[in-house]
Amino acid sequence: MSRSLFRCLAAAVTVAGALTVTPSAALAHGGPTPVVVDTARGHGNVVSFTFDDGPNPPDTLHLLAVLRKNHVKAVFCLVGDQVKAHPEVVRRIAAEGHTLCNHSMHHDDLSTWTPAQIEADLAATSALIHQAVPWAHIAYFRAPYGAWGQSPQVAADLGMQPLGWRFDIEDWVPPGADVLAQRIRDRLTPGAVILMHDGGGDRSQTVEAVAQIIPELRAEGWRLTLPLRRG
């Protein structure tokens, strides 16, 4: 499918400045597209866990232990400043088989940036990730605050699929692990990509909530997969 057709499809729906469309078989071919995906792979009761703003020891390390114990793979959306500070944690994330996502260098609002500015930022962030893990594949890009601006096309051109989310558990002000786990229960729908945080503050309650909810989801027949990937 041609890039011009991708652009026509992506332009059809604009939500909060981001390009978002219902997944279709037509977009499943070729490389990344500027369409922001918010859907987990597979059919039926599937869900994807994604974690933003890290790496952030010790919380990221505790989270990795929970995911490893439960045989779950997730997406980690990494901020360049944090990658530079904690490259050893990035190596651990990749070594344990999780998927990497570029979350910009400084967690800036990109909505008013030019394509050239966005490209420079994303390229610098990816370079830091590759310094930590030379063999890493950076599959996704997620715009800070969901302020996409012109970043979806830039990310796609750099080989990264723009990654959105179906819902955010709002863990930036920790209300308690039980409350966070209940938010997942209440908001969960088949195919959801869930936004959580392992960085940006004390995320111990998020780690506890994840440890609570995974066995419950499995018992109810949910499968934890990765988000859709165009290409």
Predicted feature residues:
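Catalytic domains of cell-wall/extracellular-matrix polysaccharide-remodeling enzymes
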Residues: H62, K84, D108-R218, W222, ...
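Compositionally biased, intrinsically disordered low-complexity segments enriched
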Residues: L9, S104-M105, G199
